[in-house]
Amino acid sequence: MEKFITLFSTAVPLFIDNIDTDQIIPARFLKLTTKSDFGKNLFRDWRYDSNGKIKKNFILNKKKYSGNILITGKNFGCGSSREHAAWAIRDYGFKVVISNIFADIFKQNALNNGLLTIELKKDFINLIYKKIFLNPNILFEINLEQQYVKFENNKELFKIDDFKKKCFINGYDDIELLFSIKKKIEIFEKKNIYN
């Protein structure tokens, strides 16, 4: 997993509530067995028409909106528990998804696959949308160590599980983190279990 401490990036505003995993990555594109190559089908039915032509009005098809941060409406990632949704978002190039609430299974899948999910207050997200539509080039700072999102003179703290935070900062998935403390585990076992 890639280390994540601080990110400076512009953002893509997708102000739609209840985006489910089938909208994120339609089921007909789930036949791959690796985590890569899903990004090209992210929001496929919203980005392209049935003939494969680009829908110019969809936010990801507008050149003025880009970046490594996706800002969404509430209840993002609801629906089925497909891990492919997190893979598609990550493969497309997003490193962070911001919402005021995520579907629980999606949130866990995202965090397990190196996609940081940040829950912020609805008022702060509304402020982001208002500002970003006026200026798509606003630079956001995501600081994981100090757990805040900042843009212009606006700053909001967010919560993250300590274990997941440590994984992101060190670039470990769950198993790699355990291997990183293997010696400590062995010492603990010798002192406490085998006596």
Swiss-Prot record:
Q: What class of enzyme is it?
A: lyase
Instruction: Report the EC number(s), separated by commas if there are several.
Output: 4.2.1.33
Q: Which reaction does it catalyse?
A: (2R,3S)-3-isopropylmalate = (2S)-2-isopropylmalate
InterPro entries for this protein: 3-IsopropMal_deHydase_ssu, Aconitase/3IPM_dehydase_swvl, AconitaseA/IPMdHydase_ssu_swvl, IPMI_Swivel, LeuD
GO cellular component terms, alphabetically, are: 3-isopropylmalate dehydratase complex
Keyword Zinc among UniProt keywords: no
The Gene Ontology biological process annotation of the record reads: L-leucine biosynthetic process
Task: List the molecular function annotations (GO) for this entry.
Answer: 3-isopropylmalate dehydratase activity
Pathway where this protein functions:
Amino-acid biosynthesis; L-leucine biosynthesis; L-leucine from 3-methyl-2-oxobutanoate: step 2/4
Q: Which UniProt keywords apply?
A: Amino-acid biosynthesis, Branched-chain amino acid biosynthesis, Leucine biosynthesis, Lyase
Keyword presence, Amino-acid biosynthesis: yes
Function as written in the Swiss-Prot or TrEMBL entry: Catalyzes the isomerization between 2-isopropylmalate and 3-isopropylmalate, via the formation of 2-isopropylmaleate.
Q: How does it assemble?
A: Heterodimer of LeuC and LeuD.
The text of the family note is:
Belongs to the LeuD family. LeuD type 1 subfamily.
Q: Please identify the protein, giving its name as recorded.
A: 3-isopropylmalate dehydratase small subunit
> What is the species listed in this Swiss-Prot or TrEMBL entry?
Karelsulcia muelleri (strain GWSS)
The upper taxonomy is: Bacteria, Pseudomonadati, Bacteroidota, Flavobacteriia, Flavobacteriales
